[in-house]
Amino acid sequence: MLARQSQEPMKLHIFRALFVVVCLTGAFAERPGGFRVIGPGGGGAMFNPTISPHDTNTVLVSCDMTGSYITHDGGRTWRMFNLRGVVNFFVFDPLDPKTMYAHATGLWRSTDGGERWDLVYPSPSAVKGVKMNSDHADEQILADPDPLKAISALAVDPSNSKILYAAAGTKESPALFVSRDYGKSWQKQVGLAGVPRRLWVDPNSAADGRTLFLASEHAIAVIGPGGVRSFPLPAAVNEISLGFGSGPQPTIYATSEHGIYVSNDAGANWRKSDLPGAGANVRAIATSLHHPETAYVSYDHLTVDGESWMGVAKTTNSGADWKLVWKESDVAAKNVNDAWITERFGAGWGENPLNLTVAQQDANLAYGTDLGRTMRTADGGATWAAVYSRRVNDAGWSSLGLDVTTSYGIHFDPFDPKRQFITYTDIGLFRSEDGGLSWTSSTAGVPREWMNTTYWIVFDPKVRGRMWSVNSYTHDLPRPKMWRHNSVLHYKGGVCRSDDGGKNWTESNVGMDETGATHILLDPTSPVDARVLYVAGFGRGVYKSSDGGRSWALKNSGITQDQPFAWRLARSSSGTLYEVIARRSEDGSIGNAGDGALYRSTDGAEHWLPVSLPEGTNGLNGLAIDPESPDRLYLAAWARATGEHGDGGGIFLSENGGKSWKQVLDKDRHIYDVTIDPQDPNVLYAAGFESSAWRSADRGLHWTRIPGFNFKWAHRVIPDPLHHDEVYITTFGGSVWHGAIDGQRRDADIATPVLEPGQ
């Protein structure tokens, strides 16, 4: 198939590429610079699917990696939008089909179908700043006044869009608040016993005396003209869902570690509802707001006929009985039509749905989101289909816009510009043979216990098809969450080699301890038949091979850190090696054993000497070296958790090999990496965890933000080798972005100036 494609006329290739781009972006306004996300799609946990009450083709989904997604065509295409943090719920206006709400760091509202978002709460005029000094640069809007504090649930009045109900406050003093002016001002109505997770307005109640239902972990609170009534839940609940039918009281479904519970009288009384079989664990549950007799529940470890199953069950009689409409074991169910994830990793990889939603207009339409996918049924569960990826050809897949993958680099085969690779977390290495139009898993031969993450690859510039990869079971390094409670000496991983362009791999690890191998560097001056390679082993140090990776030796002479967090390597044009040691503290301290470090070697890693760091900096993350001036160094630094914005982070420049430093970018203090344009050393790029990517055209002295890119957690910018005005940007949870650097300077997604990124 690939060979036949390569012989097609160029016009057909161009048409096909344009067709793919138009199909994937035609429903949405173009971002500045034409930025779009590439890759196979899916790959990470998705949450909070929410279907519009006006148009069932419009659906919102969030993830745990800060991106949010919207479709207007029933999942055929999605657009990512970014609100500077993880969205924990969506609410559609029941009267205006263009208006919707999302709660992330604050409460946001879109009035144009999800294209642009305005901050509703806190009021933009009350915003005094943004605190983001933590390792993930998690954001807290600093506002004064701030009467609501944290909002945990929201509802819009069914007959008046100006009236908003919010469960808000602190954990110690939650309360119900109401706004009658579209969120401009709020009045406290009543205190609550627990923090509500969900909030519903009874559409059948009087407009001048609404009845509200608020669900917390342990109780249902009913608030109406007669005051507040509280009904205890039968157990601490994981999920809860409510619907209003023809009866006087709503039907409520809840899941807990003890099973499913159903109430037909607003929570006053509960009955247990069991799935067929035995031993089921239940997770998500959802009913249709206007068809509460129908509900779907996510389950696993259900034993039927001696076998264990997972999937989704459905009731059409308020839990009197359940039918298993998605039933899988190790073998994929015939009625579940997944994309590449089941094909590559098996039926259990994504697990049973984390969240479910059911259309309030049509109880046969439901979505389920899991650890890597969004799945859809339009026939009441008779069939389920993936809506995160589509097959492009016999071997490749392309994203539909739902991308929740962490990427470290995009890599281009020096002998074939159409062959590209993305190094991913959780799903390992992916390969494209058609210039990025489609992608396929490329980890055949990698040991199973290493397959989770491919951190980096390197090509032999003289031997077609020869390449090396560094892999690990441990993902997301160097983030502290990965080593906070786990010994780095227990990490699994190492080096693999391919001689057929990444199609097949063999372990190439002799002499190397199992390690979280995070970077690999090839000395281009070494003999072709005896390539010199260097590897950063996180928690081990630096390994060197002088025989093309067949054998390795640890080279830590001069490195003083115990279990050094070896993270990145760099080599100057003069042959000097640099090793970046990641910080192993997260409390904001400095001047102790937790500091990161920079080392230099002038004898091929046989001996290492420390390089001074900028004052107040101990969290270095990347290093770039000017190819024409080997003493000109650019340091990417990660802020310490002190102050409002974090201290010691940004970009620093040394013109004397690290003897002294000056800061050249301060406004972004969580910089992941700096890269140099291989075609012009005057041009540099940088990115990090503050919703921005940066460009300098004067050797790093001044920086401007690249318009169009606004994913919260960026990794690195990689220039497009075929189009000098375009770049790729890898991310922590948003796959790979591709677009032009000279896009129109206007906001993308966020329409509130005080919270536009990069200020």
Where is each model-derived feature located?
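Bacterial N-terminal signal peptides that target proteins for export
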Residues: R4-A17
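Extracellular glycan-interacting surfaces
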Residues: I14, F19-V20, L24, F28-Q759
